[in-house]
């Protein structure tokens, strides 16, 4: 037998009874950039980087429970450094629980991405290979996370699917590690959690780029139109469809059906959570009713004629409430079917009749059938109920319930906000409903109070009745989600961000589990945008900030531009659009510093940690997705602040400013180790109040690479915000002074005097120079890195 190879073919002589199968044909990768050291990293690939972060930012644990109840050898008491039956201690068990939470979060986003690709093929009738990844002429770095993590620069959605397969495989491997009898080190559990956080960012990018390219969402253009937001924006003269969840394709079919049949004047489409955000990127007449924190208030207000749910952040007891109100529910996703009958294969007319016959709901898993059913059911129900849309309680019922309250205090004990509901009920009984109305916004509508009330008072309905005028008049304005940051924008702001003259990027993201109502979201955005920070925002916090107006009647979205530039408020989109915030930081390294981002995660994360002044805030974070989102930011070198409820995630990453060895970096210019200021000081930290959080966020934008001008600007804001919100100078401001040129010019003499008197620094008053005192001096050529490899081999550039 002779085997001959020729160009493009091979020939085999005398071959019999052989079947030849040709599988996937791999085309040669285009070498647009050198392949970096870590394409498609496994669990252990970036472990050294994780361990560096975990050494500097030591995990601080606050376990919610000292027991482990995960296997039948337990339950095991882990207090007092005891080990469980399997040998695990409390630190490792807490790290394990954190890893489990992150695995749930990353599975939600990655599962969403997989479902998105399936629905795109079904709804468009195209193969993934036929849909190009095209984000317009101003975006060449179309998928910076995908390129950074996998080494793939996608040309079609099929390329994104390859990256998604990698993420899915890695998630399985990490979840395997949380099984009993596997990992035993809290450090390695945290490394695995960081790995999941990175995969979460990848899954989000795949999901959002896919829907942008398939459904024609905005591609990073600024000056986006304003969308109505608030419980008062729904037109009560029309049939009302309420959508809840995060997976938009079924809702897009509703929008198509409304438009194709000319029903815009008859049907109003509104939503809660990320589905609401994404549908407005497709259908501009859609409205955002509320963020997650008001979901139960919206449902119980009875505004909707039909409710359509898909996946994530949907109340598990939604049918319990809708059955009482007679509102049918259509489940469109197999992850949330609520024991309803699957009618996917039924004709739409049969499904419509079934729902109008008074049945509580059904499942429709074909997104192309949802539009007709939802719209026609809503139209029919609107005719049935007429104009009877108002509070669910009568005046007599309201007063009867107010009088029934015995001030037992059970509700306050159950309330995560500690609201003194009984006092508000007593005031209402005496004719003062202002307390209930004021607390309506602080209440996150969890419903726990109703579960413990011995009198069965419908407390949510009481709140809605007292605040009804507020509800019907609540109308704000939100910029439509614009999607990714354009390369052209990065070219303009890369230098100011790295040098510090734009003091930082503030990412306002996450859920609505706020400690004191929704106004905090507005306060954070307005404060930082007014100081020339770049404010980017997504999800529920983006919605809630839109509900408030300044003295001139403008929301933050009307007051500030939406370019990625100083003083901008940029509404990126839904939860999965958070990936574009990661992407912006990566693009700074790629476009401004000319670093090679292809499969080069560790080096780019090192660059961001040392140079890109960015800080995330998830003030109302509640979900496992929020945990994996924050952990993904952390692995990339971006710190995050959470609200007081965020301590329930059980873990913080706190720096120790006093520990010299934690703050040693290499100066690539000289090869020597240098002790730097604690910048950024923490990687994940909970703040108790908004007054504590705002100065903390400004502090977490300090970076070792700041120029003197940039450091002076950042110190000005840090000191000013501390004086404004905490009424005192920050205790640690002097740690960030390297030279007198770092000091805010307007307070230079005052601060030099304080450095001399309070901190013992030596000052040459004749020259007004610092002679002795700083942790380190300033050198314009300082080139910080934490990676020995980069000292040895140099930085990868393109």
Curated annotation (Swiss-Prot):
One of its GO terms (molecular function) is 4 iron, 4 sulfur cluster binding. Pfam families: Fer4_9, Prismane. [4Fe-4S] cluster 1 binds at residues 65, 69. It comes from the Archaea. Disulfide bonds: none annotated. Its cofactor is [4Fe-4S] cluster; [Ni-4Fe-4S] cluster. Its EC number is 1.2.7.4. GO terms for biological process: acetyl-CoA metabolic process; generation of precursor metabolites and energy; response to hydrogen peroxide. This is Acetyl-CoA decarbonylase/synthase complex subunit alpha 2. The gene is cdhA2.
């Amino acid at each position: 037998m002779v085997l001959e190879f020729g160009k493009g073919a091979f020939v085999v002589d005398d071959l019999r009874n052989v079947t030849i199968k040709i599988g996937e044909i791999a085309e040669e990768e285009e070498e647009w950039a050198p392949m970096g050291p870590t394409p498609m990293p496994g669990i252990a690939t970036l472990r050294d980087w994780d361990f560096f972060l975990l050494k500097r930012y030591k995990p601080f644990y606050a376990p919610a429970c000292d027991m482990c109840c995960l296997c039948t050898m337990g339950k095991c008491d882990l207090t007092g450094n005891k080990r469980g039956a399997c040998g695990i201690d409390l630190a490792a068990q807490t790290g394990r629980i954190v890893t489990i939470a992150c695995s749930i979060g990353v599975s939600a986003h990655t599962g969403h991405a997989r479902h998105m690709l399936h629905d795109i093929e079904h709804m468009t009738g195209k193969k993934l290979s036929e849909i190009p990844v095209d984000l317009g002429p101003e975006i060449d770095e179309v998928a910076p996370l995908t390129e950074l993590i996998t080494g793939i620069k996608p040309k079609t959605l099929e390329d994104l699917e390859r990256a998604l397969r990698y993420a899915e495989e890695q998630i399985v491997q990490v979840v395997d590690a949380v099984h009993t009898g596997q990992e035993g080190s809290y450090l390695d559990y945290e490394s695995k959690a960081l790995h999941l956080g990175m995969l979460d960012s990848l899954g989000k990018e795949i999901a959002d780029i896919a829907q942008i390219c398939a459904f024609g969402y905005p591609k990073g253009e600024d000056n986006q139109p304003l969308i109505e937001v608030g419980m008062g924006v729904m037109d009560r003269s029309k049939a009302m469809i309420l959508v809840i969840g995060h997976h938009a394709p079924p809702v897009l079919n509703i929008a198509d059906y409304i438009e194709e049949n000319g029903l815009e004047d008859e049907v109003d489409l509104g939503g809660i959570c990320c589905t609401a955000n994404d549908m407005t990127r497709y259908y501009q007449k859609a409205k955002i009713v509320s963020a997650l924190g008001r979901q139960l208030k919206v449902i119980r207000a009875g505004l909707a004629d039909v409710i359509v749910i898909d996946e994530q952040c949907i109340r598990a007891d939604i049918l319990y409430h809708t059955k009482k109100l007679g509102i049918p529910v259509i489940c469109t996703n197999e992850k949330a079917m609520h024991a309803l009958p699957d009618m996917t294969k039924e004709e739409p007319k049969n499904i419509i009749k079934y729902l109008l016959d008074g049945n509580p709901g059904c499942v429709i898993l074909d997104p192309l059938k949802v539009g007709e059913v939802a719209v026609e059911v809503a139209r029919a129900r609107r005719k049935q109920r007429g104009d009877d849309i108002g509070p669910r309680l009568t005046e007599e019922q309201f007063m009867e319930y107010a009088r029934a309250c015995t001030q037992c205090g059970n509700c306050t004990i159950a309330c995560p906000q500690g609201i003194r509901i009984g006092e508000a009920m007593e005031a209402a009984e005496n004719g003062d409903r202002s307390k209930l109305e004021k607390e309506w916004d602080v209440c996150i509508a969890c419903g726990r109070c109703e579960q413990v009330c011995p009198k069965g008072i419908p407390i949510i309905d009481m709140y809605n009745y007292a605040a009804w005028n507020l509800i019907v008049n609540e109308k704000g304005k939100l910029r439509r989600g614009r999607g990714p940051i354009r390369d052209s924008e990065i070219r303009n702001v890369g230098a100011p961000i790295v040098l510090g003259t734009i003091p930082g990027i503030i990412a306002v993201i996450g859920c609505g589990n706020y400690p004191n109502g929704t106004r905090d979201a507005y306060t954070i955005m307005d404060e930082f945008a007014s100081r020339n920070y770049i404010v980017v925002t997504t999800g529920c916090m983006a919605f809630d900030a839109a509900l408030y107006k300044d003295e001139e009647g403008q929301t933050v979205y009307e007051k500030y531009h939406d370019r990625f530039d100083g003083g901008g408020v940029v509404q990126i989109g839904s939860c999965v659009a958070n990936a574009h915030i990661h992407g912006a930081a990566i693009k700074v390294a790629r476009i401004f510093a000319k670093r090679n981002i292809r499969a080069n995660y560790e080096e780019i994360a090192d660059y961001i940690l040392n140079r890109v002044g960015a800080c995330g805030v998830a003030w109302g974070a509640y979900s496992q997705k929020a945990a994996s989102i924050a952990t993904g930011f952390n692995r990339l070198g971006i710190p995050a602040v959470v609200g007081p409820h965020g301590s329930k995630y059980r873990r913080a990453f706190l720096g120790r400013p006093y520990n010299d060895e934690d703050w040693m970096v290499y100066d690539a210019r000289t090869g020597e180790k240098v002790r730097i200021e604690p910048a950024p000081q923490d990687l994940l930290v909970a703040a108790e109040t908004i007054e504590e959080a705002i100065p903390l966020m400004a502090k977490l934008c300090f970076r070792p690479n700041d120029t003197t001008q940039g450091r002076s600007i950042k110190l000005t804001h840090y000191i000013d915000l501390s004086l404004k919100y905490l009424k005192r100078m920050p205790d640690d401001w002097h740690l960030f002074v390297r030279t007198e040129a770092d000091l805010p010019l307007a307070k230079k003499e005052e601060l030099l005097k304080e450095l001399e008197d309070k901190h013992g620094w030596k000052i040459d008053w004749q020259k007004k120079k610092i002679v002795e005192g700083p942790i380190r001096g300033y050198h314009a050529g300082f080139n910080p890195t934490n990676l020995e490899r980069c000292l040895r081999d140099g930085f990868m550039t393109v």
